[in-house]
């Protein structure tokens, strides 16, 4: 027995099995451990049938049901989505700079179509619906019994789906039961394929709780399922046993909770459970689009301090952003490109002598008092961290910033977001007298990259390039890369401030 404290004649003790006296999966040697990026994996699910449930489409379709036919006719096939060059770049099939060699529009190019890529997979919508049911712990997902039989046979061949998963998939429901449930007021949200076939529904979890309605539950289950697949892929790729993960940080945009705690959170633990990480605990980090960079810095600090040997950072999808720009895509008679859900998982561990190091001595942060101008933000995130290391702007091989695919954003008037950021970084380099004004285009081409990420908010912020950077640094083709993200905190109406954070990874010497 371990003595906790003593008062008078009575001694209060805790059993040795109490969590205060156990240090399983925690370091007892707190000597500083240099953190490295041991692995990075991505996951995409092609979900054209879910586009109607994105925030913008769901509102517009409610106001104008006649839009449905036009929207449906502009949804892509799985073959087109898997051949789409930005999707292939996101999954490591091509290097982002290769996009510069291909004329736009990229959606008009008919190239190689592959589900499996070096950094992850693009899953068809049928299988993702099955995954939603596997992630469901409260019988919220009702799938048609015929559809369930078909998808079970397909998922049985997936290398990351287990027998236990198939058991959780269950037998499904008769289609008549699903129709009856959806006919009830607020009873269920339909789950449909691209072709319009209804294969199930999401039911509400509470009759009165507005945070447990079908649309919110669908959003949260999609985030959980996508993040879990990214983490499973990461564990497999790095040959890491699930029980060897002691801590998981989730940095998705979901808000899991109930009416008394609308964002109560800790989806991290649910994701860990779905991946068999029985010795893990975890927590969620929220910072709008800047969340993943904050989470990576925290994970690196936990490893560096010796608290944990390794930490997994996960970020699930943002279903609300499906079809966010669909009206401008319809106006331009182009495919609805926001038809994929994206997730990522990153493993940060102790220095192994090979993996790229994350430099904790050069973290950039946008402080409360820094000001909200773009120049002030870039100064905090780029100039000051470089100054601390005695580096020039050109000493960074690649800058990864907001990597939104311009083919998605430009038709709606949002411009080429990555290009604007790279021009700002180049302008700061001119102010530092490192390059001339005339050299800005060359600097942008050499140290920037075209946007290629799905517009999934936090997912698009810098992290999509991490897998490419790790590959190139380990191959000796790159020395260092900087990752910077910004967050629009003012959208939540609690502050007028923006946010930002950055870090540098470099070759392990």
Name each model-derived stretch.
Residues 222-239, 268, 298, 373-391, ...:
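Short, well-ordered amphipathic alpha-helical segments that serve as non-catalytic structural scaffolds
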Residues 223-282, 286-287, 392-423:
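Conserved beta-ketoacyl condensing-enzyme motif
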Residues 199-218, 258-298, 302-309, 421-464:
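Conserved catalytic cysteine-centered active-site region
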Residues 311-317, 481-486:
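Short beta-strand segments
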Residues 262-277, 301-305, 327-335, 416-420, ...:
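A glycine- and small-aliphatic-rich helix-loop capping segment at beta-alpha/alpha-beta transitions
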Residues 317-318, 362-368, 400-407, 487-488:
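Glycine-rich beta-alpha junction loops
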Residues 2-221, 328-393, 446-448, 495-509:
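Condensing-enzyme catalytic core mediating Claisen C-C bond formation in acyl metabolism
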Residues 259-262, 294-298, 322-328, 410-413, ...:
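Short acidic, glycine/serine/threonine-rich loops at helix termini
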């Amino acid at each position: 027995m371990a003595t906790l404290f003593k008062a008078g004649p009575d001694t209060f003790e805790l059993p040795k099995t109490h969590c205060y006296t156990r240090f399983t999966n925690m370091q007892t040697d707190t000597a500083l451990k240099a953190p490295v990026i041991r692995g990075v994996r991505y996951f995409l699910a092609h979900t054209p049938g879910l586009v109607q449930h994105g925030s913008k489409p769901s509102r517009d379709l409610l106001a104008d049901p006649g839009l449905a036919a036009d929207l449906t006719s502009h949804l892509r096939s799985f073959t087109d989505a898997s051949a789409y060059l930005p999707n292939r770049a996101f999954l490591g099939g091509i290097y982002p700079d290769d996009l510069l060699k291909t004329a736009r529009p990229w959606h008009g190019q008919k190239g190689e179509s592959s589900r499996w890529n070096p950094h992850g997979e693009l899953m068809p919508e049928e299988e993702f619906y099955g995954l939603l049911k596997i992630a469901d712990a409260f019988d919220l997902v009702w799938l048609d019994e015929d559809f369930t039989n078909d998808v079970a046979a397909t998922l049985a061949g997936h290398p990351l789906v287990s027998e236990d998963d198939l058991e959780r998939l269950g037998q499904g429901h008769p289609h008549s039961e699903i129709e009856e449930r959806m006919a009830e007021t607020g009873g269920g949200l339909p789950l449909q394929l691209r072709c319009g076939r209804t294969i199930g529904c999401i039911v509400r979890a509470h009759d009165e709780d507005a945070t447990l309605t079908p649309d919110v539950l669908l959003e949260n289950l999609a985030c959980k399922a996508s993040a879990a697949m990214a983490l499973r892929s990461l564990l497999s790729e790095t040959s890491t046993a699930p029980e060897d993960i002691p801590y998981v940080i989730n940095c998705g945009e979901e808000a899991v909770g109930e009416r008394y705690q609308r964002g109560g959170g800790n989806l991290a633990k649910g994701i860990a459970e779905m991946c068999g990480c029985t010795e893990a605990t975890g927590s969620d980090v929220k910072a709008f689009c800047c969340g993943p960079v904050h989470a990576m810095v925290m994970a690196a600090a936990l490893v560096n301090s010796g608290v944990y040997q390794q930490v997994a950072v996960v970020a699930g999808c943002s279903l609300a952003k499906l079809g966010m720009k669909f009206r401008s895509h319809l106006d331009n008679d182009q495919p609805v490109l926001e038809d994929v859900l994206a997730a990522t998982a990153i493993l940060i561990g102790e220095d192994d002598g090979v993996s790229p190091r994350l430099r904790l001595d050069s973290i950039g942060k946008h402080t409360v008092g820094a000001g909200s101008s773009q120049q002030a933000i870039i100064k905090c995130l780029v100039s000051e961290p470089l100054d601390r290391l005695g580096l020039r702007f050109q000493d960074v091989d690649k800058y990864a910033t907001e990597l939104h695919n311009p083919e998605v954003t430009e038709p709606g008037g949002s411009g080429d977001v990555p290009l604007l950021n790279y021009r700002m970084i180049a302008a700061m380099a001119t102010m530092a007298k490192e390059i001339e004004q005339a050299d800005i285009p060359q600097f942008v081409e050499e140290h920037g990259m075209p946007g290629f990420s799905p517009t999934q908010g936090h997912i698009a912020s810098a992290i999509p390039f991490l897998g490419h950077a790790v590959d190139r640094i380990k191959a000796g083709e790159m020395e260092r890369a900087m990752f910077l993200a910004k967050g629009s905190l003012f959208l939540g109406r609690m502050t007028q401030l923006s946010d930002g954070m950055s870090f540098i990874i470099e070759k392990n010497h």
